[in-house]
Amino acid sequence: MAKSRILKGDVVKVIAGSHKGQIGPITSITKDKQWVSVQGITVKKHVKPTNEDSEGGIKDIPAKLHISNVALQDPKNKDQVTKVGFEIINGKKVRIARKSKTQIKTAK
């Protein structure tokens, strides 16, 4: 299993599936299964009440998308998606957007 080049906080665009075309930052990554959650993308799920306090019903929960179904949004040209490359700048390895050759800011 290859290491993911997309990190938490990166702004991505969904390129496949029922949520195709939606854009948002990554809120969580499950590396072993290669799933990501993107802010603003939810699915409706029926939830049964567990005890007297909680209510059941149809709830919106964060959708888990496979990492291959999202692509990084180009930081320079927001309409395009790009692949991630690496370059050594001032002795540090930094992530680069391959289409625009701009450095990708890492969210912390």
UniProtKB/Swiss-Prot annotation:
It comes from the Bacteria. PROSITE patterns: RIBOSOMAL_L24. The keyword Ribosomal protein applies. GO terms for cellular component: ribonucleoprotein complex; ribosome. It holds the Pfam family ribosomal_L24. GO terms for biological process: translation. Keywords: Ribonucleoprotein, Ribosomal protein, RNA-binding, rRNA-binding. One of its GO terms (molecular function) is structural constituent of ribosome. Belongs to the universal ribosomal protein uL24 family. Part of the 50S ribosomal subunit. One of two assembly initiator proteins, it binds directly to the 5'-end of the 23S rRNA, where it nucleates assembly of the 50S subunit. One of the proteins that surrounds the polypeptide exit tunnel on the outside of the subunit. This is Large ribosomal subunit protein uL24. The gene is rplX.
